């Protein structure tokens, strides 16, 4: 089997490559069909997914069985001012990959986000795959456009929405909180935005389980359990052992101090229903996955040997 991983140097792409290389994750083995797979990792500048001709030629030349698209513009605030860049990475790129995948018969896994939802109609019920999206930010809007293009142009697709992603590699909320705690000693974090922290290990594991099936469609894949950013930050500080305190604040208080920040959904908790009912759900409780992260994390070096 031949697999192309786009955005291979990001948090998720790096973890997917690691699991394909080692044949397993912290959770368990990868599918037997993927053992000894030929893996083609690509990222900018080798492949610009927003360039149709480049994508079409690359996919036709390599003829993969599976394309896993981890490439995206994920800077939520940056998307508000860099509209064209966000559209190219989050909407146009997935369209190009979907068209190329359809032409060559490849399966396409496209990673999306909880930010496609408005988060305004909470009621305490996690949003499943049937919930109607309503993005409130440029990031969410462009990611939703990418989903629609994938659905339209590639029949053999898996759209996988995730949330609050962190990993041993790259920049993420966990590392930001640890570093800020060390530097400032006191942090303020919003306590009225709720969702599902997701370890990239879990997300990569489930994507690899999915991509060898014919169970095409839309999936949610996040850590089990729901918390606020404040709860998440408090658990990060506790597990890290950093001498710092975390105080709660409202979204309005945060916005007053950071007026240029994009709106975030207050309730973006997702339900992994389709995952449970098809390939099964091995995703860990968010606290267990975070504790495992701190057991294995080696600071700037990524993961301990």
Residue ranges and their predicted role:
Residues 1-26:
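N-terminal Rossmann NAD(P)H-binding glycine-rich loop of SDR-like oxidoreductase domains
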Residues 38-53:
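Rossmann-fold cofactor-recognition segment
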Residues 49-89, 100:
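NAD(P)H-binding glycine-rich loop region in Rossmannoid oxidoreductase-like domains
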Residues 88, 92-96, 103, 107, ...:
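Catalytic helix-loop patch of NAD(P)-dependent Rossmann-fold dehydrogenases
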Residues 148-195, 200-202, 208:
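NAD(P)-dependent short-chain dehydrogenase/reductase
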Residues 189-194, 219-226, 278:
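Glycine-rich Rossmann NAD(P)(H)-binding loop
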Residues 206, 213-260, 301-303:
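Mid/C-terminal beta-alpha module of Rossmann-like enzyme folds, strongest
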Residues 285-305:
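Amphipathic terminal alpha-helices
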């Amino acid at each position: 089997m031949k697999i192309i991983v786009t955005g291979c140097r990001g948090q998720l792409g790096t973890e997917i490559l690691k699991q394909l290389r080692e044949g397993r994750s912290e959770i368990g083995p990868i599918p037997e069909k993927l053992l000894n797979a030929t893996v083609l990792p690509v990222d900018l500048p080798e492949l610009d997914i927003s360039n149709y001709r480049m994508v079409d030629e690359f996919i036709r030349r390599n003829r993969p069985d599976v394309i896993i698209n981890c490439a995206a513009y994920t800077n939520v605030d940056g998307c508000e001012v860099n509209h064209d860049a966000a559209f190219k990475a989050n909407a146009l790129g997935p369209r190009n990959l979907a068209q190329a995948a359809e032409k060559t018969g490849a399966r396409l896994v496209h990673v999306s986000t909880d930010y496609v939802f408005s988060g305004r109609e909470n009621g305490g019920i996690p949003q499943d795959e049937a919930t109607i999206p309503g993005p409130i930010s440029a990031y969410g809007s462009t990611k939703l456009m990418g989903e629609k293009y994938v659905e339209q142009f590639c029949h053999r697709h898996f759209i996988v929405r995730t949330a609050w992603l962190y990993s041993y590699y790259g920049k993420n909320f966990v590392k930001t909180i640890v570093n800020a705690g060390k530097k400032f000693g006191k942090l303020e974090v919003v306590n009225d935005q709720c969702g599902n922290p997701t370890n990239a290990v879990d997300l990569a594991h489930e994507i690899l389980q999915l991509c060898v099936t014919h169970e095409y469609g839309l999936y949610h894949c996040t850590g089990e359990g729901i918390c606020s950013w404040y709860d998440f930050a408090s658990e990060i500080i506790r597990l890290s052992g950093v001498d710092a305190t975390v105080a709660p604040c409202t979204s309005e208080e945060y916005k007053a101090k950071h007026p240029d920040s994009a709106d975030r959904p207050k309730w973006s908790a997702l339900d992994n229903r389709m995952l449970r009912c098809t390939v099964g759900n091995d995703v860990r409780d968010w606290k267990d996955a975070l504790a495992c992260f701190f057991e294995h994390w080696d600071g700037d070096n990524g993961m301990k040997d």
